[in-house]
Amino acid sequence: MQDTNIVAVDLPGMGDSGFREEYSIKDFGECIISIIENEKIENGIDNISIVGHSLGGQVAAYVASEQKELVNNLIMIDTFIRPPDWDPSQHDGGPLRMIKHYPEKKIILERFRLLPQQDCKNDWFMRYIADHSVKETDEGWRWKFDDSMFNSLERLFGYKFTFDCPALFIHGANSLLMSGNILENIKDMYSDIMEFKEVPEAAHHVPLDKPMEIIDIIKNRLF
């Protein structure tokens, strides 16, 4: 991986990126496109690969579909993809997540959980992510992400990805998001333009469950 530029992106409303009044997959995609174009101009990068987990996979596939000339390789990791005819009016988005503040960092770190809920044997990785997912404010400690984002996020309803670059879909063998007919439906929609690879003993958070395996898969795929 020498001579390779790796950019780890915090999408708007997540990590250390700022909050916005409105969020959409399309807006997330425009942010990634801007980064790619900047890399091409500032660093002369011509070979662009995008790797996205979960929601990040949707953003990656959207960019690869809308700006085909910019993306050379696409990897999606355990990304839930709805069929184009999915009707959001028939599904309840759940209650609003309320902003909470905690008096001590130790207390909020003890509250850290994976969603969807799953066990993870790599406690060291969990502790690292939890420690980098919180910030201190005047009101106390809180999670970095915008609590209101997922209740207002404009998703890609009625949209089918049309990327034509080499693409790989990695999924956990025990992933709740791939259970039932979900994975088969994704394969039915995209097996003609995307390869699929299962990671044994991994749930939805594949990079946490099997970090070394994910690294090997990505390296073997891209380098």
Residue ranges of model-derived segments:
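Conserved alpha/beta-hydrolase catalytic His-Asp/Glu region
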Residues: I99, P103-F157
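Post-His helix in hydrolase/transferase enzymes
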Residues: L208-N220
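Catalytic histidine-centered segment of alpha/beta-hydrolase-like enzymes
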Residues: V199-P211
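Active-site loop/oxyanion-hole signature of alpha/beta-hydrolase fold enzymes
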Residues: N5-V51, D216
